[in-house]
Regions:
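Alpha-helical interaction/regulatory segments in DNA maintenance proteins
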Residues: 38-67
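Short alpha-helical DNA-recognition segment
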Residues: 32
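Sterile Alpha Motif
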Residues: 1-8
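Catalytic DNA-binding helix-loop module of base-excision-repair DNA glycosylases/AP lyases
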Residues: 13-21
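DNA-contacting surface of Y-family translesion DNA polymerases
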Residues: 60-63, 67-83
Length: 84
């Protein structure tokens, strides 16, 4: 796996946002983590980034499509997002 778009739930637009914050590989993304990547995207690229984008990042980090994230993880992400 060499491209960001090889990760589950990462399409061209989200990959482009990750590249704009300096993340160009799946390894860099995993090192940074979903929440930190989301914060940087919101701060530097897209201040309107939503919960769905956060879930996509979390799915990519876990290696699954966002629809397959466990309900507990989705609830955790929602609580975290609402606290921003």
């Amino acid at each position: 796996m060499e491209r960001l778009t090889d990760l589950p739930s990462i399409g061209p637009k989200l990959a482009g946002n990750l590249e704009k914050i300096g993340i160009t590989s799946p390894e860099q993304f995993r090192t940074l983590g979903a929440e930190e990547a989301f914060l940087r995207i919101r701060a530097q690229v897209d201040p309107t980034a939503c919960l769905h984008q956060l879930e996509a990042l979390a799915g990519a980090e876990a290696g699954v499509k966002k629809s397959l994230l466990p309900p507990e993880r989705k609830a955790e992400l929602k609580t975290w997002y609402q606290g921003l």
